[in-house]
Swiss-Prot record:
Major localisation: cytoplasm
Location of the protein in the cell: Cytoplasm
Upper classification of the organism: Bacteria, Pseudomonadati, Pseudomonadota, Gammaproteobacteria, Pseudomonadales
Active site: 69
Reaction catalyzed: N(7)-methyl-GTP + H2O = N(7)-methyl-GMP + diphosphate + H(+)
HAMAP family tied to this protein: Maf (MF_00528)
GO terms of molecular function: nucleoside triphosphate diphosphatase activity
Tree of life domain: Bacteria
Functional summary from the UniProt entry: Nucleoside triphosphate pyrophosphatase that hydrolyzes 7-methyl-GTP (m(7)GTP). May have a dual role in cell division arrest and in preventing the incorporation of modified nucleotides into cellular nucleic acids.
Enzyme Commission designation: 3.6.1.-
One example of a Gene Ontology biological process annotation: nucleotide metabolic process
Protein name per Swiss-Prot or TrEMBL: 7-methyl-GTP pyrophosphatase
One GO cellular component term noted in the UniProt record for this chain: cytoplasm
Length: 192
């Protein structure tokens, strides 16, 4: 089996990948993550996940390279990572009582054969009605500044949800393991 490389510096994605009990290394790809004019959210995450995997293919020529990218979509608009408490508070105000769809792009590149599999896995979160004090307490407690949509589903963020829907809850954290297992099986990787 070729060695696995996770093209990400995300601790959340690393933690998810450890669940498969496969040895892997993690490396940070250096790519332009800008949104292109006219590009849909799905096209964006598919392109970026593939670009992340391809960016590491030269350094890892006999490996399976996993790339992933995620955006949140609210009322047709892409929500990025907030980076500041003020933007996180605003994103959660905007999401209050609404549904946000998270699109997670996933790519698995066999760098030896150059075969690439790419997918987009949607997952929808239906938010509770959130008052200002609850939003502020949450942002202060969890500091979700590096998370699209301004919450951490693996932590207190789940308290903000009324319900969720989708095929793979791990996609919400940023690495859809069910789809990844499908891709790894296609490459002949045995799990478990």
């Amino acid at each position: 089996m070729p060695d696995l490389i996770l093209a990400s510096s995300s601790p959340y994605r690393r933690e998810l990948l450890t669940r498969l009990r496969l040895p892997f290394e993690s490396a940070s790809p250096d790519i332009d993550e800008s949104h292109r004019a006219g590009e849909s959210a799905e096209e964006l995450v598919r392109r970026l996940s593939a670009s992340k995997a391809e960016a590491l293919a030269g350094r890892y020529p006999q490996h399976l390279v996993i790339g992933s990218d995620q955006v949140a979509v609210l009322d047709g608009n892409i929500l990025g990572k907030p980076h500041t408490p003020e933007r996180a508070i605003q994103q959660l105000r905007d999401a209050s009582g609404k549904s946000v769809t998270f699109l997670t792009g996933l790519a698995l590149l066999n760098s030896a054969s150059r075969r690439i599999q790419v997918a987009c896995v949607p997952f929808t979160v239906h938010f509770r009605h959130l008052d200002e004090s609850r939003i502020r307490r949450y942002v202060e407690a969890e500091r979700p500044l590096d998370c699209a949509g301004s919450f951490k589903a693996e932590g207190l963020g789940v308290s903000l949800f009324r319900s969720t829907e989708g095929e793979d809850a791990t996609s919400l954290v940023g690495l859809p393991l069910i789809r990844l297992v499908d891709m790894l099986l296609e490459e002949g990787v045995e799990i478990p």
